Curated annotation (Swiss-Prot):
PROSITE patterns linked: SSRP
Compartments (UniProt record): Cytoplasm
Classification via Gene3D superfamilies: 2.40.280.10
GO annotation terms (biological process): trans-translation
Protein's name according to its UniProt entry: SsrA-binding protein
Cytoplasm listed as a keyword: yes
Coiled coil region boundaries: none
InterPro entries, A to Z: SmpB, SsrA-bd_prot, SsrA-bd_prot_CS
Xref: NCBIfam families: PRK05422.1, smpB
Source organism of this protein record: Mannheimia succiniciproducens (strain KCTC 0769BP / MBEL55E)
Length: 160
């Protein structure tokens, strides 16, 4: 049998850049998503946004809340497309119990970090997060700028 051809391009569908800016991410976890057919097609077209999304617990299950998947214009007319519906996360019971216990601590929440393809399945990376204060955000910006400045200095010094 021949090997599968690797398709060029990125497997990432959507990133939540604000999550790493607004939160300290303490633990990351991969989860599957329960999706409808039109959502998969839209995600393949890159019409997903998880920038304001977070995870809620209801009846012992985890749900993705606030994610937006825009339907394609050529979508079926007999299916009602709700772009902002809550989507169930596919996690095993041990992972659910662990996340639920950790998220119930004071100041912790669970946010969506990235949405991507793994083989043919849509996966979401979620993170246990603690909110940053304003001074923490400023320190991160200062550190990032200093790092870029150091690299610039080293580059110019190496040129001679």
């Amino acid at each position: 049998m021949t090997k599968k051809k690797v398709k060029p391009g990125s497997n990432t569908i959507a990133l939540n850049k604000r999550a790493r800016h607004d939160y300290f991410i303490e633990e990351e976890l991969e989860a599957g998503l329960s999706l409808q057919g039109w959502e998969v097609k839209s995600m393949r077209a890159g019409k997903a946004n998880i920038s304001d999304s977070y995870i809620i617990f209801r009846d012992g299950e985890a749900y993705l809340f606030g994610a937006t998947i825009q339907p394609l214009t050529v979508a079926s007319t007999h299916v009602v497309c709700d772009p902002t519906r809550t989507r169930k996360l596919l996690l095993n019971q041990r992972e659910l119990a662990s996340l639920f216990g950790k998220a119930n601590r004071d100041g912790y929440t669970i946010v969506a970090l990235s949405l991507y393809w793994k083989n043919a399945w849509a996966k979401i990376k979620i993170g246990l997060a603690k909110g940053k204060q304003q001074h923490d955000k400023r320190n991160d910006i200062k550190d990032r700028e200093w790092k870029m400045q150091k690299e610039r200095i080293m580059k110019n010094a190496n040129r001679g």
